[in-house]
Amino acid sequence: MLCTPLPYPSPTYVRGSEGGLGEVEEQVEELQSFCFFKMFDIILYQPEIPPNTGNIIRLCANTGAKLRLIKPLGFVLEDKQLMRAGLDYHEFASMSIHENWQDCLAHMQGRRIFAVSTKGKQRYDLASYTKGDALLFGPESRGLPVDILESFSQQYRLRVPMVTGSRSLNLSNTVAVVLYEAWRQILFEKAQ
């Protein structure tokens, strides 16, 4: 299902002085139509920290990516920190929630999935992305489970380079870095 609205109140929009669409309404209409153009899927496996997911919701709304959350979630969708981080972009993000990893996989039939982990074998910028690919990320405190990570061939296990001795990057930062590289490779299709 595309553009599943989240349980947030709709923002109030202003009308132009002539009674036509105001600038804010035009931006809303533009985002709503863009929302139906899905290039990539972002899959968060059991995310734990609301502000990270809120930031990723905003990222997905602005890039045309679909967000898939796999339960259990470490928060409720109405969490104030999640709402604050996502600003007023929640209703423009295409999102679905899956009961478990198998349920998510059933919806991804025939699509390539890249697992992003500190234990990934290939640098994210060396992967070759195409429209329709999905990017999978694990929970903030522990990353992807070993069995899920090992179910991917090495070319689909990606990592973001860090200096020696670093443990991990922030989840929302990592998603942004990898998603923008994937989008860059398809020449920022649909970007202004």
Can you say where each PLM-predicted feature lies in the sequence?
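Post-transcriptional modification and biogenesis factors for structured RNAs
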Residues: 14, 27-192
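Intrinsic disorder/low-complexity segments
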Residues: 1-36
